[in-house]
């Protein structure tokens, strides 16, 4: 399964913020430049992450963004479910768009659904804290100050 850029960017933002010193504010420009991501795309991602409570945004001079909750409380499977807009990995997953003639008797849909559930179950085992256990290495690659 391929994640959308939106979900990929969401996870990257969370990793970036988790690698920062606790309470430290970051900004969209800094994250966009670090990952070579469009600021416009990133603003949409951060807005949604804020709505979900994963990030806290502080407006005004001296403002920025930081994690809105402890990395231990941010479940990766949950983030993926809330940021992916389509888990219909084949046509027959969507009853409104399914034109496949063998769909009523085909076993593929059930196998793929089982695989999708297993994929999400693995992601459910991990938190953001698990993804930044090597925080010092991440900080070096992101060129952050320790």
From Swiss-Prot:
The family database entries (Pfam families) matched by this protein are listed as: Rrf2 (PF02082)
Q: Does the keyword Transcription apply?
A: yes
Q: This protein's superkingdom?
A: Bacteria
The Swiss-Prot or TrEMBL record lists the needed cofactor(s) as: [2Fe-2S] cluster
Q: How is the cofactor bound?
A: Binds 1 [2Fe-2S] cluster per subunit.
Which keywords are on file for this protein?
2Fe-2S, Activator, DNA-binding, Iron, Iron-sulfur, Metal-binding, Repressor, Transcription, Transcription regulation
- The entry's [2Fe-2S] cluster-binding residues are 92, 100, 106
InterPro entries from the entry? TR_Rrf2-type_CS, Tscrpt_reg_Rrf2, WH-like_DNA-bd_sf, WH_DNA-bd_sf
Q: Which residues does the UniProt record annotate as the domain HTH rrf2-type?
A: 2-133
Query: GO CC terms for this protein?
Result: cytosol
**MF terms (GO), sorted A to Z:** 2 iron, 2 sulfur cluster binding; DNA binding; DNA-binding transcription factor activity; metal ion binding
* Residues of the signal peptide: none
Give me the positions annotated for DNA binding.
28-51
Q: Which GO terms describe its biological process?
A: regulation of DNA-templated transcription
* Role, per record: Nitric oxide-responsive transcriptional regulator. It represses the expression of flavohemoprotein hmp and the nitrite reductase nasD. Probably plays a role in the up-regulation of the resDE regulon in the presence of nitric oxide.
NCBIfam families xrefs: rrf2_super
Please identify the protein, giving its name as recorded: HTH-type transcriptional regulator NsrR
């Amino acid at each position: 399964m391929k994640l959308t850029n939106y979900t990929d960017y969401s996870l990257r933002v969370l990793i970036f913020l988790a690698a920062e010193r606790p309470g430290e504010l970051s900004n969209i420009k800094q994250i966009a430049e670090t990952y070579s991501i469009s600021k416009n795309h990133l603003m949409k991602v951060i807005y949604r992450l804020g709505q979900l409570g994963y990030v806290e945004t502080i407006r005004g001079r001296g403002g920025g963004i930081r994690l809105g909750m402890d990395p231990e409380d941010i479940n990766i499977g949950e983030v993926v479910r809330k940021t992916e807009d389509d888990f219909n990995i084949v046509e027959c997953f969507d009853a409104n768009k399914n034109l496949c003639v063998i769909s009523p008797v085909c076993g593929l849909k059930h196998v793929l659904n089982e695989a999708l559930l297993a994929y999400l179950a693995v992601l459910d085992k991990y938190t953001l804290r698990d993804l930044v256990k090597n925080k010092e290495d991440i900080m070096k690659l992101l060129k952050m100050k320790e």
